A protein has these predicted regions:
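Transmembrane alpha-helical segments and their cytosolic interface motifs
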Residues: 64-79, 108-113, 175-199
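Alpha-helical transmembrane segments and their helix-start/interface "positive-inside/aromatic belt" motifs
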Residues: 1-9, 22-25, 99-115, 214-226
C-alpha cells in the first residue's frame, strides 16, 4: 500500500521535472512551456509551408517526453495495484473475523477504483505520447489577449470552417486524425483486456463453493465493474474512430471551444 501511495505522488509530481532532464531541453515552469508553444505555433502557421520548425518541435517533443514519463509511472501503478489487489483478495478470503473481512473488502474496492483511475491516466498519456502535437495544442491559451496567437487561431478557425486548404492546416488535420486513431487502437486493446479480466474473475467466482458467498459476491462485483469499464472504453473507441474519419470538423470544434 505504501508503494502504491508513493507512486501516486510521483505520478503527479515527477513527470514535468523528469521530462526536463532528458536531452532536448526542458522548462522551469508550465507557463514557460506554454509561452514557447504559443510562439512556436504562431511561427509554424505563419510559415505556411507545413514544415514543423524547431520553434514548435522543441515544446512538442518536451510534451511527448512528459507523456512518456507519466505513462511509464501509470503503468507501474497499475501493476502495483494489481498485485495489491491479489494480496487483498487473499486477506479477504482468509479473514477470520468479520471486522477483518470488512476491512479487506473496503481495501479491495479502493484498490479497484484507484486501478481504474490509473488505467485512464495510462491510456490518456499513451495517446499523448503517440500524437504529441495535437495533445500540446490543448495547452494553447486561446482565450488570452495575446494578439499574435489570437490572430493565428482566428485564421485556423476560418480555414477549417471554409474548407480553405494549406500545408500547415493539412499537418494539423493529419495529426489530429492520428491522435484519435491512437486512442481508438488503445481503447480497443483496453476493452479487450477488461473483458478478458471480467471473464477470468467470473470463472474464478464459479470455482468457489457456495459456502464462500462473500468471496463470490466480491468477485462478481469486480467482474461487473470491469464489464462496465469495458463498455465505456468501447464507446470511446467508437467515438474516436468516427472522429479520425472526419477530423476537420472535430478540429474546428476544438479551436472554437478553446476561444
Amino acid at each position: 500500500m505504501v508503494t502504491a501511495g508513493a507512486l501516486v505522488l510521483v505520478l503527479f509530481l515527477a513527470p514535468f521535472p523528469t521530462a526536463s532532464l532528458w536531452s532536448g531541453g526542458g522548462y522551469s515552469t508550465r507557463a514557460a512551456l506554454v509561452r514557447s508553444l504559443s510562439s512556436g505555433f504562431v511561427l509554424f502557421w505563419d510559415g505556411g509551408i507545413g514544415v514543423v520548425s524547431p520553434n514548435l518541435i522543441v515544446p512538442v517533443d518536451f510534451w511527448m517526453r512528459f507523456h512518456v514519463v507519466k505513462a511509464i509511472l501509470a503503468a507501474a501503478l497499475v501493476v502495483v495495484l494489481a498485485r495489491l489487489g491479489s494480496r487483498t483478495w487473499t486477506a479477504y478470503t482468509s479473514a477470520t473475523t468479520a471486522a477483518r473481512k470488512v476491512a479487506a473488502g473496503m481495501l479491495a474496492a479502493a484498490t479497484a477504483v484507484l486501478g481504474m483511475v490509473a488505467l485512464l491516466i495510462l491510456v490518456a498519456n499513451l495517446q499523448g505520447a503517440i500524437a504529441p502535437l495535437s495533445s500540446a495544442l490543448g495547452l494553447l491559451p486561446m482565450g488570452t489577449p495575446d494578439p499574435a496567437l489570437a490572430g493565428t487561431v482566428s485564421q485556423v478557425r476560418h480555414d477549417l470552417a471554409t474548407g480553405v486548404g494549406s500545408p500547415a492546416l493539412a499537418v494539423l488535420v493529419h495529426d489530429f486524425s492520428a491522435y484519435h486513431v491512437a486512442m481508438a487502437g488503445i481503447g480497443a486493446l483496453t476493452t479487450a483486456g477488461l473483458l478478458a479480466t471480467a471473464v477470468f474473475l467470473w470463472r474464478r467466482r464459479r470455482r468457489l463453493t457456495a459456502g464462500r458467498q462473500p468471496g463470490r459476491q466480491l468477485l462478481a462485483s469486480v467482474a461487473v465493474a470491469a464489464v462496465a469499464f469495458a463498455a465505456f472504453f468501447a464507446v470511446v473507441t467508437a467515438a474516436n474512430l468516427s472522429t479520425s474519419a472526419h477530423p476537420a470538423p472535430a478540429l474546428l470544434g476544438f479551436f472554437e471551444g478553446g476561444g
